[in-house]
Amino acid sequence: IGAGCGSFTKNYYRSEIKNIVLTEKDQLNLKNLHNKFKKNLNIKISDLSIDKIDDKFDTILYLHVLEHIKEDIKELENAKEKLNNDGHLVIMVPAHQKIYGNLDKAVGHFRRYEKDFFKDNLLDLKLINLKYLDSMGYILYFLNKIFFRNETFPSKFKIFLWDKIFTPISTIVDFITNYKFGKCIVAVYKKR
């Protein structure tokens, strides 16, 4: 859901997956998705919302999408209805409302999330995994909010530093700290 430019799909695509449906509302992204995956016969691209799609799925992914949807609970209820029995719902969202700031507003986030939101009985789905990711990102995002309060988008230099230096460090720190804090929350559910 919310495939964006398709980078996740491109990086993790496997031809043995029989049916992949990418949904995207942004018309430019939709056009780019059609161009990028036109040779992949097992990928369907749609501008429909999850409740309008006829298929049922083994897995539904919301990777940095739910925070852009005003009625997030309703969206998840619709997704649950589209899951096959024993299907998985995977959600990745920005964590910690206390660090919500100008960057969040600028990119259309309605909110950031707390772990409590992803309680075990969310929509009567079984919680399989719940953890934070990107520990260094949390620290840097928090510092950025304090020292660059009015900044809406990070500079190219900050993005470079993040991608090349802090992301690899964050991966190690996440593991060492057993995913106890971070800039993002990942929740994995199974339909009972």
Language model: regions and residue ranges:
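Short, hinge-like loop/turn segments at secondary-structure boundaries
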Residues: 38-41, 107-110, 145-149
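Short, solvent-exposed loop/helix junctions and linker helices
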Residues: 69, 112, 179-180
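Conserved SAM-binding loop
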Residues: 1-101, 119, 187-190
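Acceptor-substrate binding/catalytic loop of class I
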Residues: 102-117, 132-133
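Conserved S-adenosyl-L-methionine
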Residues: 126-136
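Short aromatic-enriched loop/helix-cap "lid" or pocket-rim segments at secondary-structure transitions
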Residues: 57, 101-105, 140-145
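A C-terminal cap/extension of S-adenosyl-L-methionine-dependent methyltransferases
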Residues: 134-192
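Localized chelating/binding microdomains
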Residues: 94, 111, 129
